[in-house]
Amino acid sequence: MSSSENFVIALDGGSGTGKSTTAKLVAKTLGITYLDTGAMYRAVTLAALDKGLAAEEGPAMDELLKNLDLGFDSENHILINGVSRESEIRGMKVSSNVSIYCALPSVRAAMTEKQREIGKKQSCILDGRDIGTVVFPDAKYKFFMVTDVKVRAERRYKELLEKGEKVTLEEVLNNLVERDRLDSSRTNAPLKKADDAIEIDTTHISIQQQVQKILDYVGVVA
């Protein structure tokens, strides 16, 4: 891998597969930018819920997207119109609605444009559902992460409990199953593995092993 050329690493997969944690560590190891695209979609969802907007196309949603200022602070936490809402976007309220809002063509178009703007300026790793198929179909490196849904549910359940959320394991599991269904079946930019992506099953491996697999393919020794 040349250190002088800009490149994109596309990391796709379903909810709870460890994409974000893995992407952050890969970015840190390589010294490149990490773009949390999932946080961007969660931020749009939270902003829409704040305003009581239904998940449908129309002038109200267009106006929201037009005036929505998304950014990240020094710790890579999402900023919505300059205000950190990191803890709120990770809650079950947003998790239960994000797949519905992010399926809207206007939302995906707006977020895809923002993601491409960032990715064209610097080397970066992006994690999401359609990075390797839609956002950066010509990305130099593409990976697709899969994990048994019960394992994903247990991981997410533990995370939510640590954050003080009152939720049951069954609720988390049902939420993941439904999100998988919505993400994979939507017409616009569905969750699917790019033909040229490397699949990584994270069910029985640690985060560090996930990171190392990507670094091995990229050609870097951690």
Give the label of every model feature segment.
Residues 9-11:
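Hydrophobic anchor at the beta1->P-loop junction of P-loop NTPases
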Residues 64, 115-122, 129, 133-134, ...:
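Small-molecule kinase domains that catalyze NTP-dependent phosphoryl transfer to phosphate-bearing small molecules
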Residues 28-91:
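N-terminal phosphate/diphosphate-binding loop that engages ATP/GTP or pyrophosphate donors
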Residues 19:
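Conserved lysine of the Walker
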Residues 38, 82, 111, 125, ...:
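Residue-level signal for inorganic ion chemistry
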Residues 14:
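P-loop (Walker A) phosphate-binding loop of NTP-binding proteins
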Residues 22:
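Hydrophobic positions on the alpha1 helix immediately C-terminal to the Walker A/P-loop
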